[in-house]
Amino acid sequence: MWFKNLTLYRFNKPFSIETEALETALADFTFSPCGSQDVSKFGFSNALGKQGSTLVHSANNRHLICVTKEEKILPGQVIKESLEEKVAQIEDEENRKLAKKEKDALKDEIITSLLPRAFSRRSQTRALILPELEMILVDSSSATKAEELLALLRKALGSLPVIPLSFKAPVEANLTQWLKDGSAPLPFEMQDEAELKSAADEGGIVRFKQQDLKEDEVLAHLETGKEVHKLALHFGQSIALLLQSDASVKRLKFSEEFRAGNDELGNEDPMARLDADFALMGSELVALMHALVSALGGLEETQA
């Protein structure tokens, strides 16, 4: 349940919803496994996984939701070889070349025949709806997966007025200034990893890992016009993260000390522990968002 990445969105119109209403809306779009002829299936599933029983898990008016996607695995090479074999057989028997339309129809037939025997894979993506911040945080490093989740949520609710999070000043401008200053605004602390890019479209990219970012070797690249597009940070003592110029957060990791905050509850009641951990995570992510918006100079104004 602990989030590992953040793709960030904000509401551009006032938004609020009660847990029960959200649960009811999602219920019409619950996940069901692939049938024999399904290529993929996508829908909402229990927010807390196997331990949970609801599509929405809420605490302090913060709502956790989850989508599950199942996809049949059909190797392209297998389809290609089967198609070539079938085309060659028919062309030999009928002594003619098949048209593209005929080949496409054969390909569809092959896929249909392979689907019932194909393996499948499942993936899950969670999101945290934060009405207090007018934000949605999606636990995914993929913008495509985040947009898939939001598209299904929009379909379930009828409308979902969200846009990607954007700031008054370019994120890379702030990250570059922090590197020049040798420190990030509190409560953030720079770590030992960064990626610098030239402002030119075809300019160079330089990556530093396990390196003191205050050294002249690093700063020299700023003098040549490069900007910081990725920067490893600590948020207080609780979270390590990699902040990117598109305002996404990768490699989000809560410290062991922070995660141990509910250890006194034990694990005898898994649901009670999950509920407490969710409340703990939600509160810290809200604090992180407040600090991030402040450190980056505020959000860009939106048209209501």
From Swiss-Prot:
Xref: InterPro entries: RdgC
Q: Which Pfam families does the UniProt record give?
A: RdgC
GO biological process, alphabetically ordered: DNA recombination; regulation of DNA recombination
GO MF term (any one) = double-stranded DNA binding
Provide the Gene Ontology terms for cellular component.
bacterial nucleoid; cytoplasm
Provide the primary localization: cytoplasm
Q: Which residues lie in coiled coils?
A: none
What are the alphabetically sorted keywords of the record? Cytoplasm, DNA recombination
* Record's subcellular location: Cytoplasm, Nucleoid
| Domain of life, per lineage | Bacteria
Similarity remark: Belongs to the RdgC family.
Which PANTHER family does the entry mention?
RECOMBINATION-ASSOCIATED PROTEIN RDGC
Q: What does this protein do?
A: May be involved in recombination.
Q: Could you tell me what this protein is called? A: Recombination-associated protein RdgC
Q: Which gene encodes it?
A: rdgC
